[in-house]
Amino acid sequence: MKARAQELKASARRGSRADKAAQEEAAVVEKIAEMQESDRAMAERIHAVIKENVPELAPKLWYGMPSYAKDGKVVCFFQSAQKFGARYATFGFSDKANLDDGAMWPASYALTELTSEAEAMIAALVRNAVS
């Protein structure tokens, strides 16, 4: 919660929309660089996949983790295994994502490594989430 409060304060101090977007992306890249190697490698690839496939999503920190927002609302996010003491990292979606599929659907995915198949699945899911 402290991380989120700091994010909100920093966001309020930023200047123009372009300056804010550049600063938020820089904060995401910096946070990714601080991660342990396995999480960092996955987070870097996810960041690249989202920027390549869904460029309308804006990177920003959300509770201290990389996330991607549309119109200021977080659609998807990455959680490092290290930060949460988990055995795997997580790529997940907020309730703003358009993933509804019947009465039940997955909202997060465990990641132990990022294969080309997983990258393709993430790209497809994120494209669908913002459609």
Predicted regions and their residues:
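Charge-dense, helix-prone N-terminal extensions
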Residues: 2-131
